[in-house]
């Protein structure tokens, strides 16, 4: 949620930045109109209340002097009725303004590239060499089926499309990746480990920006009015909802493994095969709470923490700075990490690392005090995937495959796999 003062005092500047996002400005314009009406009503209400106080004093004086006060009493009744009417309108406007505020996205940071589509995202750097195969490489869904480590068919029978069973060494590979990532982030990158709830309430989904605008993308448990989490970002960020943190305790850095659940509304026909776009998938998340002046340095470090996973797995990747049109609702600046997937002959997103500045903190009321007794300020929140597990498995299967259909295990994972170096075709 944006600062109301920013909207009031820098209306045209904010409007331009939202235009750079490609946003429909209808709701934003409506905010300006309603806020103008609200200020007019406040001025009128305050004037009437002042008038009512004066009339009350005049009535008291007339009564003390045994004079007729009926006319003044009638005047005060009319004024009182008008104040009640204005107060009702003010409450209605405040409710509308709150709803509009919840629907306005974050404004891009000045370093975010201005663009009209994903084609305008800017490549920042690349790492690793794309492998040149001397045989026709298989897609990960075929590799997983042939190796008997991924089962999409029975998952479709048990549940439906966009689900998978990990089996045998496939399940062990996923578990090895989880442990490797969590160990790296907690032991070397300084994150505190968490295992969060997989269901959250509406206040939590609102705090991180999924609600009210993106409810159709979430899975709702109607009987309880709980949502299955789309990412561990939601419960971990809301861990500090309504908290006032101490400055000396910042930054707070958390890493969390969780299953994630997404309806993928609007994704019909896209990535229908394999692990790239599932309704349920595992992910290791990185979340930070920092002082405002530290958040952009923190973003670079957080992005580097996610990159380190790919480097140690020796998977080729690139980093993109996302343009204004491809930024997402809550971010002021976002980097995407894309890993090379041979079956697509392209890089595919495997992590997003974002600085939300105070956008989420305002929605979730997460603040800190610089000194005891000082006025609380909003923290800046950041998060990133470190990494998405299904896409990491897909990248390993495809990039580490051999001509005989086997898949080598990255060296960094072999200790987590009990020394297993290769997944071979069943005999």
Swiss-Prot record:
Q: How does it assemble?
A: Homodimer. The tRNA molecule binds across the dimer.
A cellular component annotation (GO) from this entry? cytoplasm
Broad class of enzyme this protein falls into: ligase
Instruction: Give this protein's Gene Ontology molecular function annotations.
Output: ATP binding; catalytic activity, acting on a protein; serine-tRNA ligase activity; transferase activity
Instruction: Offer one Pfam family short name for this entry.
Output: tRNA-synt_2b
Q: What is its main location?
A: cytoplasm
Q: What is its EC number?
A: 6.1.1.11
Which SUPFAM superfamilies does the record associate with it? Class II aaRS and biotin synthetases, tRNA-binding arm
What pathway is this protein a component of? Answer: Aminoacyl-tRNA biosynthesis; selenocysteinyl-tRNA(Sec) biosynthesis; L-seryl-tRNA(Sec) from L-serine and tRNA(Sec): step 1/1
Its subcellular locations are: Cytoplasm
Protein name (Swiss-Prot/TrEMBL): Serine--tRNA ligase
Q: Which GO terms describe its biological process?
A: selenocysteine biosynthetic process; seryl-tRNA aminoacylation
Instruction: Name the HAMAP family for this protein.
Output: Ser_tRNA_synth_type1
Question: What is the UniProt domain comment for this protein?
Answer: Consists of two distinct domains, a catalytic core and a N-terminal extension that is involved in tRNA binding.
